[in-house]
Design a protein with these regions (language model features):
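A structural signal for short loop-to-beta-strand junctions that line the ligand-binding cleft
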Residues: 103-115, 145
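An extracytoplasmic/periplasmic, membrane-proximal ligand-sensing/linker region
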Residues: 40-41, 47-51, 245-331
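Bacterial N-terminal signal peptides
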Residues: 9-20
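Bacterial N-terminal signal peptides that target proteins for export
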Residues: 1-11
């Protein structure tokens, strides 16, 4: 009997050693939901992002489920309701994700050329004789294409740097105003469907690499000051282990020498990304300043003293933040 008890104890101990690893092996793989900025058609984005997502799955060990929102607001709301865990955002939509959706910037993109920043553009058909002055006449004779309401280069930048300083409201300036993504606006101008539209240097350069005939059919008549690159944002309440794996993937993907890194960079270049650099919410300070500047200019145009004072206070606070940040980073 004593021997039997010993055998049972040994078997029980062996069972306890084996079962946890078996259960662990059979545990379902965690799914991480990743939203992708709607800069062009979802069909195009899916084909370009699929191999990058496959690499993300391999390196993190998670199942990565992509979410292609039809517009920028869809990405913000998806994160707000915890339908997504992280996403590639524009700066303005990313700012909204931080404000409303519990988001947090952890990396940001950089251009394949290695340079930082891109620019908002105003484009017209190449065959058109339109000048910027003629566009700004606001005689309601032109069909205008603008970006998504939460697009930095498609809406915020042209409003802040071009229209608002002149007291121009697009709805009152043009015959029609159509909101669409950069690719749609680029094609609409190239085909003469639109007389003028916003766009950005990234989308134009990307299209040049894919099919330069489209670029030959458009002409740039205005260029903005440099804009910060796009942020990648995750939910602040994500599991720390998930955050650690995601951070490692983004900060190392496409980096370093060798054929594997070169392959990864080639995949990223198809969506005009050179790689990712560490970042935090201070990355959004320039966009907050742009937003506050537009609000101030609109208040000034309307002549509302209370709104002007409030806008000036907000703008001054943001400028002080930027100055303090510049002081810390220069040390």
């Amino acid at each position: 009997m004593k021997c039997l008890n010993i055998v049972r104890s040994v078997l029980a101990a062996a069972f306890m050693l084996v079962v946890p690893s078996a259960v662990l092996a059979e545990a379902p793989v965690k799914t991480v939901n990743f939203s992708i900025l709607a800069t062009e058609s979802s069909t195009s984005l899916q084909s370009f992002w699929a191999p990058i997502i496959a690499d993300m799955e391999k390196q993190t060990g998670y199942k990565i489920k992509p979410f292609y929102g039809s517009n920028y607001t869809a990405l913000i709301e998806a994160m707000r309701f915890k339908q997504t865990d992280l996403g590639w955002f524009s700066n303005q939509s990313g700012l909204e994700a931080v404000r409303r959706s519990g988001g947090e910037v952890f990396v940001r993109t950089f251009d394949p050329s290695g340079r930082d920043g891109y620019r908002s553009l105003i484009i017209v058909p190449a065959k058109s004789n339109l000048t910027l002055d003629q566009v700004l006449k606001c005689d309601k004779s032109l069909n205008f294409g603008i970006g998504d309401a939460k697009s930095t280069s498609g809406t915020l930048a042209p409003m802040t740097y071009l229209f608002a300083p002149r007291g121009i409201k697009p709805a009152e300036c043009f015959k029609t105003v159509r909101s669409a993504n950069h690719q749609a606006n680029l094609f609409a101008v190239a085909r003469g469907v639109l007389d003028v539209a916003t766009n950005n240097s990234t989308a134009v350069n990307l299209q040049k690499d894919r099919d330069s005939s489209v670029n030959d059919a458009i002409r740039i008549i205005w260029t903005s000051p440099p804009l910060p690159e796009d942020p990648i944002i995750w939910r602040k309440d994500l599991d720390p282990q998930v955050k650690a794996r995601l951070r490692k993937f983004f900060e190392t993907y496409g980096q370093g020498p060798g054929p594997e890194a070169a392959r990864q960079r080639a995949l990223l270049s198809k969506v005009s990304i050179g790689g990712f650099k560490p970042a935090d919410n201070s990355h959004l300070l320039p966009v907050r300043e742009m937003e506050a500047t537009e609000i101030y200019l609109v208040a000034k145009e309307d002549g509302d003293a209370a709104k002007i004072a409030a806008a000036q206070k907000v703008l001054a606070g943001i400028q002080a933040e930027r100055k303090a940040l510049a002081g810390r980073t220069s040390k």
